[in-house]
């Protein structure tokens, strides 16, 4: 990996133990942050996530939820009833990520216009 601004080459070993990388290992991924954000308000069912974000495929949603469950961030509660009912909620460990997710939301709101302009400029540049 190369930092172009500083002109420094890094190996992947240079980032081992980096706290930011540790955090991103847990919440990184296109949908994980969004899923966690919606779980801050309380339990959600699988189809509630599908309705909130219809662009996420069932397979991807399943994978992201499984990874969060595997990492101890969310709890999957299966109710013994017909039809089956499954709810997802934040674990105590998952709740420790709440301020991180809320800060990310605040940052996104603050800089959304700037990011949108950058994205538009990139798209215009790609057309050239």
Curated annotation (Swiss-Prot):
GO molecular function annotation: DNA binding
Keyword Ribonucleoprotein: no
Top-rank lineage group of the source organism: Bacteria
Pfam families: HxlR (PF01638)
Boundaries of every HTH hxlR-type domain copy: 18-116
InterPro entries found in the cross-reference section: HTH_HxlR, WH-like_DNA-bd_sf, WH_DNA-bd_sf
Keywords, in A-Z order: DNA-binding, Transcription, Transcription regulation
Protein's UniProt keywords contain Endoplasmic reticulum: no
Name of the protein: Uncharacterized HTH-type transcriptional regulator YdeP
Organism for this UniProt entry: Bacillus subtilis (strain 168)
Gene: ydeP
